């Protein structure tokens, strides 16, 4: 998993969209890791391994004496099974979906120097044969329920995915799903690309303010 972060990262977008000056104020402070962050990183690596294995890629399972627990196995299964079900449903439409695992996406056309890493981008066709991009994000936390509804992190990932690959299936619809197994939360938000682009235009001035 990439560990480089943009100043206007998607994961911190809720903060910089609501308080633009905070980005530069915090720039000099080091990022402090934690046990929870380390566990989350390992769980994401296991998720990546399981999906890549399904895709018949040659991969080695990540190892951790501390974090490789039965619970991690269970919650990563929830994620992998959900993602695989999306891919299989798209295949039923007659298309071969494009699947991008831990994909770096660039949304610098919206937020200066903006980029991030999407856990999963799946591009293909929906149930009606229309172009669709589905963005999935895995959350290991159990303290705060994360809703996909108009989630700025997910919307920025979707914008980056559209900019890079949207033309391949003439994407008309965006779906964004948060998978948070410890809270039994699988939350999905769907919107037309036109709505996503309207939101993107509305946040451009805020992003510039935060960056400067």
Region locations from a protein language model:
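Mg2+/Mn2+-dependent nuclease catalytic core
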Residues: 95-211
